[in-house]
Amino acid sequence: MALYDKIGKTYAQTRKSDSRIGKKLLELLESSQARTIVDIGAGTGSYAFFLAEYGYNVIAVEPSATMRNQAISHPAIEWIDGYAENLPLGDRAAEAAIIMLALHHFQDYQQALREVCRVVGKGQIIVFTYDPAMITGFWLTKYFPSLIDDVESTFISISKLSNEIYALTGNSVNVIPFRVPHNLSDSFAAVGWARPELYLDRNIRNGISSFAKIDNDEIEQGVLRLQQDLETGRWDKEYGNLRKQKQYDVGYRFIQSR
């Protein structure tokens, strides 16, 4: 939680829900006929708010007061101070659960998954996460190489996570790749895959947890190199084809258990 108390002060400014991610959530939830959703590690509640606007009742669980204090209120959202590993909710308190780029921050993700299963029973679980096997192919690591170690040490492999969810739930588990739009509005780590200039913006970097864990010297050197490569045209020479693409598979995945 200390990490998100540190980076969370301006989190809501850059980490806004993206409609394409939200619509994919709606599509996945539609088959479950759930009406009450628990959003675990809800942050500032951007996706809780998105679902509430579409008629869902949402229980948003978030341990960081810094995050909760930035949340936009909604009559269909109930905010709860709590940790994923010990959810302050009764058995079958919700019919489905979402975990949006939060699982890798849980102290004990396996205990958290057991708690999720307790709270939703046989209901649907949707995890939005990242495939750590993809990180070495992302050009951003050429400027900030510590991203590789951070991602590989914090994200769980997709196959392992899928197998663990299946073992806990007994439900079918589907992995759905999410191709990140070039104009993503939720500024998580891959927001600038086709817009490298975004990473020069301190506000963007401040909303990305991986940057908070990188040494300041590496960040300064990486930003300087990226700025120089953009000014000289070197970045466009090597990666400029990305600017022409509307979507790109950087490695983000929805894991759906139903």
What are these regions, as identified by a protein language model?
Residues 110-123:
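A short glycine-rich, Lys/Arg-flanked "PGG" loop and its adjoining helix->strand segment in the class I
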Residues 153-169:
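Short alpha-helix
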Residues 101-102:
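Short catalytic micro-motifs in class I SAM-dependent methyltransferases
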Residues 38, 44-86:
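Class I SAM-dependent methyltransferase SAM/SAH-binding core
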Residues 174-258:
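Conserved Class I S-adenosyl-L-methionine
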